Amino acid sequence: MRRTVLGIPAALLLLSSTACSFSTKDPNYVPPEPLPPLEQLKQVPVTEQTSLAAGNDVTAFVTPDRNIVCAMTSARGGHLNVPYEPNSYSDSANNKFAVVPVVHCELAAYPKPEVDDVADDCGGTGLGYLGGTVLLTPDSAVYGSCRSGVTEMEAEFGPKGSKDGPVSQLRELSEGQNIERNGLRCSAYNSGVACGNVSGGVAFFVSREGYQLVSDGGKTVRGSLKELS
């Protein structure tokens, strides 16, 4: 009996010394700065994209915070084949136009376009040049467009969004993952999305805080975010 009583504290001491371990956060640790968009797209491995297919030769995804939706798709004469907005891409009248690979994104919360980045005066359309959309082609990246009202992304996940519609049916691209289609690549990182034509040196980054438009292989950067942080 005496041996049993003495053995219990020893066993408890052994358990307490082996089972309990604590990690403390280094107060001096400084997380690395986010990579520039083109570098992020180059360095992160491409993920499997089959689960993100949205039909009709389109790959589409939303970010985990439901602030950005993107379609890696095609355009004909400015008509985009996207699964979340009405479009006339399939009209036979557009068959005369060349098919161009593009990435189109919409944001629920977004910054205004910088004055120097307004790409259209919207003359004669009765529309305004608004933010909340971005379009990547193999040669350029443009933030904003001529439109009125809200985008589908705003309608579903904006301040008064319904959280129900075509965007809500799309799958997530997880933070830090890359996806590629037709020579264009996208990455969800730094609470936003970067997409680009890596070989052409053209890219963009968008988030609710701001945007970057990158050209000339990273030598030219425009937009409301001069640096990512």
Regions found by a protein language model. Name each.
Residues 64-77, 181-201, 225-229:
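Extracellular/lumenal glycan-associated surfaces
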Residues 21-24:
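Bacterial signal peptide processing site
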Residues 16-19:
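C-terminal motif of bacterial Sec signal peptides marking the signal peptidase cleavage site
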Residues 28-51, 77, 82-170, 202, ...:
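A low-complexity, Ser/Thr/Gly/Pro-enriched, surface-exposed linker/loop concept
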Residues 1-8:
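Bacterial N-terminal signal peptides that target proteins for export
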Residues 53-67, 71-73, 115-116, 175-181:
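Extracellular glycan-recognition/adhesion modules and their associated mucin-like linkers
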Residues 9-14:
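Hydrophobic helical h-region of N-terminal Sec-dependent signal peptides
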Residues 166, 170-214:
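Extracytosolic low-complexity repeat regions of secreted or lipid-anchored proteins
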